[in-house]
């Protein structure tokens, strides 16, 4: 299986992997009932006809099923991965072979990553996208910061705060020189909205809303219950240990593990390690989450306490500088360090660059300190479950991606009479319950049905929604 004759609008590692990718896409479809039901329900209506979706989300097999669902609903698509290590090359090849522009290679350089992101916005056939589907907010930030610089505020371009920002800001400077005047303004004007997949990207959206700089309506997919309480929790519960094992072949049972953060991702990560037989410690800044961790039986400590004690370290906070150089200096010889938050700045990777690095295998590095003690770093501090393993299972991603599809329909087809303003929204609970309902039969769940008198007694409709918006699941 090769690309369609004459179709060259893609960059993948090896297009000959497309057959392998297509077989795995077929397998994944069986495990993604929400997306398949969405195709069946909305396919004939073509609600995304005319949508030009710029997608920046891990180019995995599961994402391939999402892409083909969006296409089945009428959308035209361009796609990149939102992480330099998360692409599954056979998945990217299968999507390219189907004639969909995709620019994604496992192990991209940062320069390639941002060059590929820029390719999202120069549409095949001319023009620009009119929708963004984002994970982490990089595609959204590309337009917002590009427009800011185009409008004359360029001082920030000379003040990068990380290696990644150096590369990103260099690209923006290049674009300002090479693209026609008003390039970013045209893109910003053409886009109708963005749906955001993950916690980090959602924080960026709320920050822009607070500052009054958000350019379009946005739907926070992450805080749909059927995303955050399933993908973030149960997905991490399965994929974290998978990544650590594939990377290191270490015996988990009996090891001491430290998880920084006890939000949904941290909860899933701690459970993953406990189920593997680890003795798990947790650090937290939030007293509520700290109390939850303690009540679950975890030892709640600081990173300073854990550094000399733990064998395995996992960051899951969405914050920066959680594991510092000083922490790593205090760790045991060959302690394993990894991150399952979106960005690599949870671990002070930049401060390790002047030390001796020995690559063991792809996405596994041994770093030696001057005192000769070493640590094992997985995926250079980027997402361990996608860099060292295959990410979350298809079933749980079906729920997340069904939410993404519904969010794209809402913003593109249902934004009538100014329904959505330049603010951040969440999908209504009726859709959240619908997404859950679509996944029940696959795992043999039988719902109890409320009688009318029972529904009246608790003040809900028989068909739902069954909980108030402020209910905490």
UniProtKB/Swiss-Prot annotation:
Name assigned to this protein: Adenosylhomocysteinase
Organism placement in taxonomy: Bacteria, Pseudomonadati, Pseudomonadota, Alphaproteobacteria, Hyphomicrobiales
Source organism: Bradyrhizobium diazoefficiens (strain JCM 10833 / BCRC 13528 / IAM 13628 / NBRC 14792 / USDA 110)
GO process terms (BP): L-homocysteine biosynthetic process; one-carbon metabolic process; S-adenosylmethionine cycle
Function: May play a key role in the regulation of the intracellular concentration of adenosylhomocysteine.
A cellular component term, taken from the record's GO annotations: cytosol
Gene, per the UniProt record: ahcY
Similarity comment text for this entry: Belongs to the adenosylhomocysteinase family.
Pathway given in the UniProt record: Amino-acid biosynthesis; L-homocysteine biosynthesis; L-homocysteine from S-adenosyl-L-homocysteine: step 1/1
Catalytic reactions of this protein: S-adenosyl-L-homocysteine + H2O = L-homocysteine + adenosine
Binding site for substrate: 60, 135, 197, 227, 231
Main subcellular location: cytoplasm
Co-factor remark: Binds 1 NAD(+) per subunit.
Residues annotated as transmembrane: none
EC number of the protein: 3.13.2.1
Domain of life (superkingdom): Bacteria
SMART domains from the UniProt entry: AdoHcyase, AdoHcyase_NAD
Binding-site residues, NAD(+): 198-200, 232, 261-266, 284, 319, 340-342, 385
Subcellular location per the Swiss-Prot or TrEMBL entry: Cytoplasm
EC supergroup of this enzyme: hydrolase
Presence of the UniProt keyword Transmembrane helix in the record: no
Family matches, as CDD domains: SAHH
Keywords of this entry: Cytoplasm, Hydrolase, NAD, One-carbon metabolism
Gene3D superfamilies on file: Adenosylhomocysteinase-like (3.40.50.1480), NAD(P)-binding Rossmann-like Domain (3.40.50.720)
Cofactor: NAD(+)
GO terms for MF: adenosylhomocysteinase activity
């Amino acid at each position: 299986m090769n690309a369609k004759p004459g179709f060259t609008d893609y960059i993948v590692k090896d297009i000959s992997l497309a057959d392998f990718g297509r077989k795995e896409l077929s397998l994944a479809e069986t495990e993604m009932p929400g997306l398949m039901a969405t195709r069946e329900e909305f396919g004939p209506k073509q609600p995304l006809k005319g949508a030009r979706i710029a997608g920046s989300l891990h180019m995995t097999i599961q994402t391939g099923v999402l892409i083909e669902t969006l296409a089945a609903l009428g959308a035209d698509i361009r796609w990149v991965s939102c992480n330099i290590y998360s692409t599954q090359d056979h998945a990217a090849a299968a999507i390219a072979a189907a004639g969909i522009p995709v620019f994604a290679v496992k192990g991209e350089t940062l320069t390639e990553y941002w060059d590929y992101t820029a390719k999202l916005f120069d549409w095949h056939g001319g023009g620009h996208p009119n929708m963004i589907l984002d994970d982490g907010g990089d595609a959204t930030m590309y337009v917002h910061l590009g427009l800011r610089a185009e409008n004359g505020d360029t001082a920030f371009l000379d003040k990068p705060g990380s290696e990644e920002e150096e590369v990103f800001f260099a690209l923006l400077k290049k674009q300002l020189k090479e693209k026609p005047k008003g390039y970013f303004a045209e893109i910003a004007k053409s886009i109708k909205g963005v749906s955001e997949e993950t916690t980090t990207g959602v924080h960026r959206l709320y920050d822009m809303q607070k500052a009054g700089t958000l350019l379009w309506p946005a739907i926070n997919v992450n805080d749909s219950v059927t995303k955050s309480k399933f993908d973030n929790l149960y997905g991490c519960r399965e994929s974290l240990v998978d990544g650590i094992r594939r990377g290191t072949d270490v015996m988990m049972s009996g090891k001491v593990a430290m998880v920084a953060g006890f939000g949904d991702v941290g909860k899933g990560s701690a459970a993953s390690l406990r189920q593997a037989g680890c003795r798990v410690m947790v650090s937290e800044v939030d007293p509520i989450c700290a109390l939850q961790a303690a009540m679950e039986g975890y030892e709640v400590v600081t990173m300073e306490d854990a550094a000399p004690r733990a064998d395995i370290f996992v960051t899951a906070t969405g914050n920066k500088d959680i594991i510092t150089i000083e922490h790593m200096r205090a760790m045991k010889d060959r302690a394993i360090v990894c991150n399952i938050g979106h960005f690599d700045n949870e671990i002070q990777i930049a401060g390790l660059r002047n030390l001796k690095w020995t690559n063991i295998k792809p996405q596994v590095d041994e770093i030696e300190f001057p005192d000769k003690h070493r640590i094992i770093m997985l995926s250079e501090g980027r997402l361990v479950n996608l860099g060292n393993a295959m990410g979350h299972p298809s079933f749980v991603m079906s729920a997340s991606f069904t939410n993404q599809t519904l969010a794209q329909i809402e913003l593109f087809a249902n934004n009538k009479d100014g329904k959505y303003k330049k603010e951040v929204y969440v999908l209504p609970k009726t859709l959240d319950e619908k997404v859950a309902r679509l996944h029940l039969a696959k795992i043999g769940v039988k719902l109890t049905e409320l009688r009318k008198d029972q529904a009246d007694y608790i003040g809900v409709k028989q068909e739902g929604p069954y909980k108030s918006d402020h209910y905490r699941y």
